Every structure is written in C-alpha cells, then in structure tokens.
C-alpha cells in the first residue's frame, strides 16, 4: 500500500488483521469511490492469508469512525444511471467485506454515519465506545436520498423493521447505549480498550444472528408487516406533505427487501438511489448542506480574531439563560452573568441545570460532566468578575437608552479590548454604539429563541465595527455551535425583515375571513415546519409583532399590519403559548390542545372565519412577499451573498429545505416568472406585491442569484 492510502493493513502477532482508516489530509474520514481499489487489495490479502483469525476495522482519527460517503461523488453523476452504478459499486464492496471467511469487527469511536454505518453493518459484529462523540445513524434522507450501499437491507434484519424504519426515515442518530439496546452494536467499552476488545471479539467464532425482540418478530411477519407499513406510510405522508420523495422510496425499498428477499431489495435500493439523486429536492438539500458547511468555515472577516477565553452576559432572562448555556456547555467557555437581582441569576443557572439534567436522565452525559459544565457559569448583581471578559453579550430589554447605558458600563468595568455584543432583534447597532468610547468594539449578535435549539445567529457590524471584532464574534458563535451569517445594520436585519411581511400577510388574510387552521395548513403543505399563525403563538404574539412598527418606520407602508387586530389580540392578554392564550387553545403547561383554534379569536377580530382561498393561493400570497423582500435584501447588501440568504432563511425561520432557500427557489422559478407572479398579485391585492427593482433587472437580463459557477458541489 502507498503512504497516501486511506486504508492500511497491519497483521498483529496474534494473527488478527487491523485495518486502520485514515483519509489523508482530512479531519474526518469519508468514503470516496477511489478508495474501492485500496479496500479490495486489502480484502484480497486477507482472503489469501489462511492463518488469520479475524479482522478489525478501526479509525485512526481521534474522534470519528467514518462520517459518511463523500457527497461530491453524487454531484459528479450526470444521470440516474450513473448514480445507480455508484450505489451498486458500494453494495458490491460491502458484500465482499461481509463474505470474508473470518470474523470481521467494526471498532467504532466517534461519528459512524451514512456509508460509515453501512460498512459497519457489513461487518459481522460491531463494538463502540461509550464516548459522547460516538453516534451511529443513516442520515441520507436529510439529503433527499436513501442509504445506497446496503443499509436499507441490512439494518432491518439486524435491529428489526420498525427500529430501522424510524432510523432511516428520520436520519436519527443513536448514542452508544441506545445502539446497544437496539442491537445495532454488540458491546460498549471505554475508548482506551476499544481495539483490544475488538480483537478479542474477532478471535471468537462467528456467533449466531441475534434474536429480535418479540415485537419486531411479529412486525416482520406478513400480517404485522402489512399493518406496520400502512401506518408508517400514513404517518410519513402527514409529516412530509408529499414534499420529500425519498421517504416514500425508503419505505418501498425496505418493504421490497422483506417481502421479496434481499437480492430484490438491493436492486430496488440502487435503482431508487439513482433516481432520487437526480430529483430537484435532493439537489436542493445537498446545496443547503454544502452552503452550511461553507458558512461554518467563513471567518467573517480577513482580520485574525482577538482573544476569546471568557464571556460575560448581561441579563439572566430567557435569552440570557440560553446564551449562557450554549457558551458554557457547547463552547466550553467560562461565563459570568450579571442581573439586577439574584432571581435573574438563579433563573439563568436553573435554565442550564434543567437542560443538563435532562441529558443526565437520558444518559447522554454523566452527573460529573453536568457538574463540570455547570461550574463554568457564575453570576453577580454587579460587575465583579467582569474585568477580564473578552466579550460581553447584552440580553436586556429592547430599550435603546438602557442598551446605551450597558455599553458605557461595560467600557467602564471591563478590559480595553472587551467586545460589546448586543442581542437586539430590532434596534440599530449604530444607535446602540452612538455614545461608545470604543464603537469599533460594538457589534450585534442576534440569537433566535429557543437559543439551545435554533442553529442560526446573525452577526451585525455597524459602520465603525472593526474587522477583528467581526472575526472574534463569528468565532464565538461557532464555538457555541451556531451557524453565523454576517448581515448589515439595517432595520430588522435579515431574518426578521423577510419574516415580517410573511406573517403580516397571514394576519391580513385572517381579517379577510380565512380560518387560522387553513392558513397554517397551507404553509405547512408548502413546506414550512409550522404555519405563520402558529409561529406567532410560539415566539409570542407580543414579541413577534413588536418589530412591525420599527420596520414600517424604516421601509414604509408595505410593512404595516392591521393595527386594530393586533391591538385587540394583545389587549385580550393573548401572548401565545407562553401565557396559554393565543390563536390556539392550550392545556396545562402551555401545551396546544390537539391543534384546536380558539373559536373566540374570530369574534375578537370581527370576522366569521370562512375560508375562500385554496391552499396554493394562501401559500403564494405569503411566500411571494417573503421572496420579494429577500431580493431587496440582496440588492441592498443586507446579506453578503445568496448563500447567506438561503442559510439564514432555512436555519432561521424554517424555509423549506427541499427548495434550497429563497434564492435557489427564485432561481428555480426564474426571475421572469417571479416578476410576472408578483405583478399579477399586485393587480389583485395592491402595491405591496410590486416586484422590487432587483427582480425586474434580473428578469430583463435573464440573471440568477446563484451564478453558473456556483453548483451544489462542495469546494
């Protein structure tokens, strides 16, 4: 083997072959088509060595086994036949591993995903570490694909059909103990003894196939299987609304393998993989994947980041508590919280305790790890412990004089290099920095709620913010596990600016008599995770509508909402889920009562609630305003690129990923079609639908947001 080989064979003195996986020059192992020849050469040596007792596949990387196949291979395929051939080649290689005459063990530490898990499934036994980094799964569905190297056939036979369907249809990743319970791995051991434990397992005679639990055996029978697949199809259709063809094909392929045998199953798998690879949904989902990967690598500016060893947070409320958790528990940085009273500090500490305790209860971390992470967070009602903080995040009320006061206090009580980052959602960063002694160290860092779940943050420099401040803030966001996009300091920034007209239109249609559930269902069918009215309930009606006057003052009438309707709802003390009173009915602890709309809402706003528009018309009226505003943001350089605009919308508001984001969707529709549709809607519903200048210019020049050089390939 050459020194650049990703697979290296070493035969130990006890006649166990260890195949180390180490893709040269890469942080993580991914499978590439060109590795097939290397693996086959090793398999040939193994078959020819009659003295071998067993084989162990193990990664030489510090924290991953195999993170999956290289997705770029799919983009190089010109048609479905080429993609199908790629899948068949993978299937053949896995079959050769499975056919080895001696026990073959996969020794897994770190991520074992996609093609990595398919390789592990082809081994005769699997053993993994109890490390928090160890996860096993088949996430191909998230790219609009299915496992193409035998995963749809081997997994159901190993863990049972219902468990396999759940894993493959959702892309769910199992931790070590979950994998052991499911029968996906045979043992869980400390990382220090992984290799030796795998070697000992390899020396044993090949054991009989694990017996499936009674429930799985019943579901594997003809009657149980028929019932299961009928229920799974129904549930999946409700969830995907028909927008993700991969899910239906996954069900078909697994059912084919169980009903007609694995040979037919492998054939169906390869064929489905090839066809799915060519779908616009898969192409869009892969584009989102590559774009998010690029954004995570983007340093934000050309300047090197400044020191980032500890962080301060002003305000221990919902946002402050969430920011403290991601900073300490995700980023590993010491955090000092300041609040005006001890209750605020205790709230923030309890926020982190509750999240960590849930992880302990689910056995994701141990109690000592919880205590270690919690020890990173401390608090005070004054600025003691703030003098050495490298960056301070402000998460207080949306009040400009208060935030300006916070800037002055931080400049007085912290180091000369300390960055002040405001979590404002609506106030201009330039105004917050107006009286600052060091305005170059003031920046916006806009988190979305709930902080621990929402992946996006907006980094907002104002005109005087230094390049180093931008780079340091972007670095912090990445340490917090966030995907940061740098946006301009204009009213609403990017995400809230494109979201506001979308929600405004939903409220206007409500005043026209459309029913709440009809509006929400139409946008869910379009592809959003929740409808606009439900979203307003989730974020808080008071919070969600607070930015509307700011946007209307900045951009004019197109951002106006039916003020009397919003006032009526707020005056009736309806804030949404958080106080159990909103557009929907809520039971105990703010839980929605089976998606039932509160009928009193119609009387409150003075309408009957009789839907007249089709779902397509409802979706078009909401989405077109969002797209038009996104194009304006592109024109005004609120966002730096179409890439950032797509990621911001997908990660920030749940824009349908299978459409690739607003800019890829507009490119797919074509600028001419966009302009024609907006002009038609403007004639029907008024000038707020008038196409922006950017779209008109692009239609005239036949341009696109994503240039021809920008494909769905990773760089």
From Swiss-Prot:
Q: Which reaction does it catalyse?
A: a (3S)-3-hydroxyacyl-CoA = a (2E)-enoyl-CoA + H2O; a 4-saturated-(3S)-3-hydroxyacyl-CoA = a (3E)-enoyl-CoA + H2O; a (3S)-3-hydroxyacyl-CoA + NAD(+) = a 3-oxoacyl-CoA + NADH + H(+); (3S)-3-hydroxybutanoyl-CoA = (3R)-3-hydroxybutanoyl-CoA
Gene3D superfamilies linked: 1.10.1040.50, 2-enoyl-CoA Hydratase, Chain A, domain 1 (3.90.226.10), NAD(P)-binding Rossmann-like Domain (3.40.50.720)
What's any one GO cellular component for it?
A: cytoplasm
Chief location of this protein within or outside the cell: cytoplasm
Identify the stretch annotated as signal peptide in this record.
none
What keywords are annotated for this sequence in UniProt? Cytoplasm, Fatty acid metabolism, Isomerase, Lipid degradation, Lipid metabolism, Lyase, Multifunctional enzyme, NAD, Oxidoreductase
Query: Where in or outside the cell is it found?
Result: Cytoplasm
The record ties this protein, via Pfam families, to: 3HCDH, 3HCDH_N, ECH_1
Which pathway does it take part in?
Answer: Lipid metabolism; fatty acid beta-oxidation
Q: How does it assemble?
A: Heterotetramer of two alpha chains (FadJ) and two beta chains (FadI).
Q: Which HAMAP family match?
A: FadJ
Summarizing the function annotation, the protein's role is: Catalyzes the formation of a hydroxyacyl-CoA by addition of water on enoyl-CoA. Also exhibits 3-hydroxyacyl-CoA epimerase and 3-hydroxyacyl-CoA dehydrogenase activities.
Question: Mind telling me what this protein is named?
Answer: Fatty acid oxidation complex subunit alpha
Organism, by scientific name, is Salmonella gallinarum (strain 287/91 / NCTC 13346)
